[in-house]
Amino acid sequence: LQIAIARDPAFCLLSQENIDSLAQYGQISYFSPLYGSDLPSADLVYLPGGYPELFARQLYRRKRLFNQLRDYIEEGGKLLAECGGMVLLSHSLTVRQGGTAYEMANIFPFDFTMTTRTNAGYRQAEYHGLALRGYESHYTETANPDGNLFTATPVYTMRGNSTSVPLFRYKNVFAGLVRWYWGEMDMLDLWKKVPTETNSPAFPSFWQKNI
């Protein structure tokens, strides 16, 4: 497998154990959304967490990469986006209340706004029998009017309380605000569990290519 991982100051929350887990299955290459890299040819793309809010203006300008991500997704490419990686796939990111809403890749219709309130804690989920464990930590509020169209499975605290943001799926894309731990698991199992009769919606009307 050819595995492409985003890595730069905006997407830097990478677990070495997760990288080692992926390295068992193929060759890893890195690219930088922040510095204008093209999307490498890949069988799997991993967008980890980080601090996109610190570089929102620069990321907003990466229209070429956004279009490459859309083409990759429409062609059935596998992609996992965690926390900051999910923000990159959202409709927009507002760094402060009342500030500029910077358009992101516009894969999902969610609008993120940075706040002073943290959401943090260990999380768990189950996707078609696959048990997931990870950690969530962010300062964002999410407006997702069409979010239910994309829900793959709910996410819970370790005490069993539901969280506000589930794990989302569109085609072969999984996205959420949790940074999952793959050290003792096979990340590729996510796609093995995708039902044959997929109920992923067509790209909704909000989706438009950036010119």
Predicted regions and their residues:
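Cysteine-nucleophile active-site neighborhood
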Residues: 52-128
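Active-site proximal loops enriched in glycine and acidic residues that flank catalytic Cys/His/Asp
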Residues: 7, 32-35, 48-50, 83-86, ...
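Short loop/turn hinge sites at secondary-structure boundaries
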Residues: 35-37, 76, 158
